[in-house]
Amino acid sequence: MITFKGIELETNDISFRPTLITEACAKVVDYKEKKILDLGCGIGPLAIYFALNGAKEVTASDIYDEHIKLTSLNAKKNKANIKIIKSNLFENISEEFEVISCDVSGVEKKIAEITGWFPEGVPKADDSGANLIIRVIQDSLNFLKNNGELFICATSFSDIAKIEKTMEENY
C-alpha cells in the first residue's frame, strides 16, 4: 500500500505508482466542478483525488487489466465515485469532457525496454517516444467539450518538438 495526497492506494509490483508527474498534475489540472477523463489512469491516484476534491464527474481509463482492477479497488476503498473503463486511448470512450488529463507512455521504446519500466501488456511508445501522445492530441478534439482543456505528460524521453508541432497543428 502507498499513499498519494492522503489517499491510501493498493498497488503491486507490476503496476505504475504515482510519480512527481502525478503530483504536478494534481496541482495544475483545473478539475473543480468539471467533468474529467483521466486517460492512462494507472492505479487511479488522480481520478480518485479529483473525485474526492470537487470534480463534478470523473471517468478513469487504462488499457492494462491490472490497472483497471486496482483503480476499481482503490476507488471503492476511498469511497470515490468514478466511472472506470478499459480502453486503448479513446477506443471505448463515448462521452465529451471538460478536462482530459493524460499520462500515457512518452518514453521512447528503446529506453522503456532497457529499463523494464513498463509491465508486459502495457503499450510502449515508438522510437520517438511521441506516437501515443500525438494520437491523444489528435483524437482528443473529438472528446473535449467546447473550451475544454487537455493536460498531457511528456518527458525529455519524448520527441518534444514533434509533440509541440502536433499541438500547434491541432489546437
Where would I find each of the regions flagged by the language model?
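Short aromatic-enriched loop/helix-cap "lid" or pocket-rim segments at secondary-structure transitions
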Residues: 97, 111-115, 163
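Mobile active-site "lid"/loop adjacent to the S-adenosyl-L-methionine
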Residues: 104-133
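Conserved Class I SAM-dependent methyltransferase catalytic core
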Residues: 130-171
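Class I SAM-dependent transferase core
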Residues: 1-30
